[in-house]
C-alpha cells in the first residue's frame, strides 16, 4: 500500500500552473530525493502532502485517505507526517526541549514526563542534548535545524518531509545537518527530501525524482545511472551544472 499517492494532480496559483498532471506513489521505507531548478514545483508538491497547500484538481491520497475529502480530518493526517522547513520554524520563546515536547503533549496527549524523556533521546540522536535548555536565538542555524529535525521525529511519524533543509545554512553548518539526516535514513525512516545537496542524494536516495516547470520529467531508482547520464535533456543540463559547479 503506497503511503502517498498523487493521481493527475494539478495546482494553480491564480493563472500560474505550479503542478502539472502529477502521478506519483511513495512507498513505506523509501528515501526519495526530489531535485530540479528553482520554481519547478518541488516544495509545492511537498506542501500538498501534509495539507499546507490545496491541490486544484486530481486526487492526493495519504495512507489511502483522500486528503481533500470532507470526511478526512487534516489534523489526523498531519499526526503521521513530520515536516522540516527551510527556515526551521522554531518557537523563539521556547527552549529546544520545549519546542520538541509541545506537539506530543498537545496533540498526542503525552504526559510532560513522557514527552521530555522522548525529546531527550531525540536530542541525543541529533547531538544536541547539551543545548536542551537553549533558546533558538542562542543557537546557530545548523543547531536550530537539528532541533527542528528532532521535533519532526517527536510525533513518531510514518513519513518525514524535508523542504530544502540546508539552503538557509552557512556552508560549515550543512555537514552536521546532512549527517543527522543520513542517520535517520539508515534507521529506516520514510523520507521525501527536496534538496540541492547532490552528494546527499547520491549517497542516501533510494529514488530520484527530477522536476522542472511543474512537471515530473524523471523518476528513477537507478540513482547512479541518473547522475551518470540522465535521460531527459533538462535533467542533463541541471545535473551538469550542479555537479560541475
What are these regions (language model features)?
Residues 2-219:
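ABC family nucleotide-binding domain
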Residues 222-245:
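C-terminal boundary and immediately downstream tail of ABC-type ATPase nucleotide-binding domains
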Amino acid at each position: 500500500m503506497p503511503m502517498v499517492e498523487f493521481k493527475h494532480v494539478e495546482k494553480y496559483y491564480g493563472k500560474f500552473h505550479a503542478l502539472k498532471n502529477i502521478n506519483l506513489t511513495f512507498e513505506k521505507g523509501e528515501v526519495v530525493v526530489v531535485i530540479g531548478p528553482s520554481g519547478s514545483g518541488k516544495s509545492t508538491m511537498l506542501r500538498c502532502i501534509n495539507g499546507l497547500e490545496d491541490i486544484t484538481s486530481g486526487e492526493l491520497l495519504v495512507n489511502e485517505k483522500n486528503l481533500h475529502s470532507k470526511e478526512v480530518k487534516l489534523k489526523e493526517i498531519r499526526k503521521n507526517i513530520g515536516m522540516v522547513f527551510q527556515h526551521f520554524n522554531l518557537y523563539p520563546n521556547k527552549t529546544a526541549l520545549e519546542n520538541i515536547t509541545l506537539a506530543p503533549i498537545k496533540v498526542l496527549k503525552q504526559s510532560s514526563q513522557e514527552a521530555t524523556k522522548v525529546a531527550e533521546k531525540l536530542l541525543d540522536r541529533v547531538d544536541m542534548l547539551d543545548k536542551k535548555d537553549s533558546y533558538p536565538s542562542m543557537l546557530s542555524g545548523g543547531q536550530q535545524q537539528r532541533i527542528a529535525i528532532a521535533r519532526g521525529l517527536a510525533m513518531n511519524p510514518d513519513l518525514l518531509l524535508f523542504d530544502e533543509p540546508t539552503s538557509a545554512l552557512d556552508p560549515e553548518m550543512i555537514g552536521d545537518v546532512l549527517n543527522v539526516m543520513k542517520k535517520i535514513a539508515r534507521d529506516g525512516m520514510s523520507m521525501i527530501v527536496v534538496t540541492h545537496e547532490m552528494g546527499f542524494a547520491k549517497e542516501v536516495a533510494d529514488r530520484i525524482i527530477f522536476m522542472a516547470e511543474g512537471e515530473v520529467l524523471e523518476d528513477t531508482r537507478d540513482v547512479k545511472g541518473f547522475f551518470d547520464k540522465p535521460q531527459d535533456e533538462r535533467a542533463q543540463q541541471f545535473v551538469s551544472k550542479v555537479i560541475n559547479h
